Amino acid sequence: MAKRTLGLAKAAKAKKQKKEQEHQEISASPDEESSSSNQLTIELPEEIDANNEISQLKGLHKTYLQSERDNELLVNGIIHECDRLLRENDSENKQPLPAVFHAIYAIALAELSKFHTEELDKVKEFFIAALERVELGLEKNPNDINLLVAKTKILLDQISLQYIAPLTLESDVKELDKEIDELLDAALSVYESVEARAKELKDYSIFDDSETLDILEALDDILDIVDNFGKENQGDDGSDEDDDEDDDEEEKSVELAETHPLYKIKNSDKYDQWWRDHTHLYLDNLEKLENGSPELKREVCHRLGQSYLQESEVPYSVFTTLKYDDEYDGIEELEGLTEKEAQKISQELITKALDYLKQAKDEEDPETWVSIAEAMISLGNLYEVDSKEQEDLYLEAEKILKRANNVTNGKFQEELDNLLP
């Protein structure tokens, strides 16, 4: 899987909102009496019906999702609007509020936790309130697919911010009221019910939405946090030494005790495989839509391509080491693989990666062209030197890099220089 340098909890902390000090107005609720002196003016998307309050709420929610998601004032604005609609609905005995209302309300409550990551009690309160809201929605709208998406998002964020963020290398599973792998299983089970519900309804439009795709990214973030857990703490002993090699060695040496809450997840391929399988299914569901988003499809294909490239790293390294490193002369295996086995596995994985990277190609984004060229070069390296297969791959990669370099005024010159003799 493609890994990130920052997991969800750190990214949330890094994107602390800037406090708004001026008196402003939330345009979605012009009649609302607010005791807060901090208000915000929001320009809603053009397609939003200004005369429909639920449509306005959806517009506020969409505005937040399309932003940097670093403005607590906007999240509070969504919550205040939900509170107003709820009070108004209760007092005037209107028709029950729709499922999407409960979904937006619950997600906004959970989002507040990302602005208070240092206050664990508040984080817990926000998630309790969010899950209560989504369950209320499900009571009134059983198996509603939007509510199931919201519940999955909230559960995954809760795992990251409430359960993983406070952990240290010394943490013990006995300190937690629930095991994290069981919480993760429960969250993923809810997402599987989203897939099942879409299949039952023969309506796959829920997957034509970046908010649904965020679920797979949230899982990827969690797995990334687990994979790298503790590494940032290594070397924080007050020493002024800054030796890159020592730092690399320290990062590689981090191991979790069997009693650590993250041990089971870190030492299992189960969740990586789940991510891969359900990302494939996501793509399948997108392709069932006649007018599905090309941007979303490219993004899913890019992620799949990167995941196969990452999986190829170990066998690729084994092959190049056994074949070209004189220090390993006479050694038959590394990582349980012979040279031939490593070569075959690497070729298969990078070929799969190339297929998805080509589907992810965007004519308006040269970076996507370069991803294809780099994968071609890696695949070429797995063939015999000067073989036809290698030369063909190198030539095609060179053409792609030259084109990308030309349209970006030399941005990829280094990649070209590395390829050309």
UniProtKB/Swiss-Prot annotation:
**Region Disordered: what ranges?**
1-41, 230-259
Q: Which InterPro entries match?
A: Nro1/ETT1
Gene Ontology, cellular component aspect: nucleus
Q: Where in the cell is it found?
A: Nucleus
Entry's Gene Ontology BP terms:
positive regulation of SREBP signaling pathway; regulation of translation
Q: Which UniProt keywords apply?
A: Nucleus, Transcription, Transcription regulation, Translation regulation
- The chain's disulfide connectivity reads none
Q: Where is the composition biased (Acidic residues)?
A: 235-252
Q: Function, please?
A: Required for correct translation termination and probably involved in regulation of hypoxic gene expression.
Task: Give the record's family classification.
Answer: Belongs to the ETT1 family.
Write the protein's name: Enhancer of translation termination 1
Source organism of this protein record: Candida albicans (strain WO-1)
